[in-house]
């Protein structure tokens, strides 16, 4: 990657923890200017402070991606603050209700769709507009291994992540000639604060779902995000790339 990302402007949603935090730090270490958005502004500010302490450049923004007007406002602010947008990591997401499809509520379904699918769409529509102004860019959408298979009890989450992959593939075709690459990453079960709160027995069961018999690390996903953001991935668009310890190969 060399110095190719130095001073490139990257926008990361859900950047205050987990995969978003790891992706933000990976991009910053490669020289990118990172705009970190999160519903939890304190966590976003913590990540910014840690990046600044390492000599990087970053700024925090409070954002709920389920509100299109809020997304538009934050991206406009990033353009004003840093002069453009070159990289976007649409990572913000929630888990949703755990229940069989027939027991899911319309309210729960709508909530997970609003963040996990609508939020990606809202971000993309404004990111694409911004990237056209600078001659192109790279959009990385955080899907999931559950964007490729089913998982009992998670109908809303699974449907949303399948939708993210379809949106990624369609947009990659539509904007290839504009120099905008669009790819999706499919993390397996990653050792984030959400999973770390589970009992040890439950953690062991989740680890066993992966042939590598462990959880992934946020930094392992961040490394792929960094590659897809870079010119090293210049002929890669419309793809879906699992980071799953062999989960989908079972």
What is the role of each PLM region?
Residues 4, 95-98, 149, 209, ...:
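Short C-terminal tail/terminal secondary-structure segment
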């Amino acid at each position: 990657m060399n110095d190719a990302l130095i001073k490139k402007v990257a926008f990361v949603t859900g950047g205050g923890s987990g995969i978003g935090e790891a992706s933000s730090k990976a991009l910053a270490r490669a020289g990118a200017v990172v705009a970190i958005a999160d519903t939890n502004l304190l966590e976003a500010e913590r990540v910014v402070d840690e990046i600044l302490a390492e000599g990087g450049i970053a700024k925090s923004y409070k954002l709920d991606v389920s509100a299109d007007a809020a997304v538009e406002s934050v991206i406009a602010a990033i353009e004003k603050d840093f002069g453009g947008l070159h990289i976007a990591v649409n990572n913000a997401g929630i888990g949703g209700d755990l229940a069989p499809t027939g027991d899911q509520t319309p309210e729960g379904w709508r909530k997970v769709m609003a963040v996990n699918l609508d939020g990606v769409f809202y971000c993309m529509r404004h990111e694409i507009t911004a990237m056209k102004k600078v001659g192109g860019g790279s959009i990385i959408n955080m899907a999931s291994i559950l964007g490729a298979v089913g998982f009992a009890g998670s109908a809303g989450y699974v449907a949303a992540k399948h939708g993210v992959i379809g949106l990624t593939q369609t947009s990659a075709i539509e904007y290839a000639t504009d120099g905008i690459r669009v790819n999706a990453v499919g993390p397996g079960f990653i050792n984030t604060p959400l999973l770390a709160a589970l009992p040890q027995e439950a953690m062991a069961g989740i680890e066993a779902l992966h042939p590598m018999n462990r959880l992934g690390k946020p930094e392992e996903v961040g490394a792929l995000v960094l590659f897809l953001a870079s010119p090293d991935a210049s002929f890669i668009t419309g793809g879906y790339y699992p980071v799953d310890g062999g989960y989908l190969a079972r």
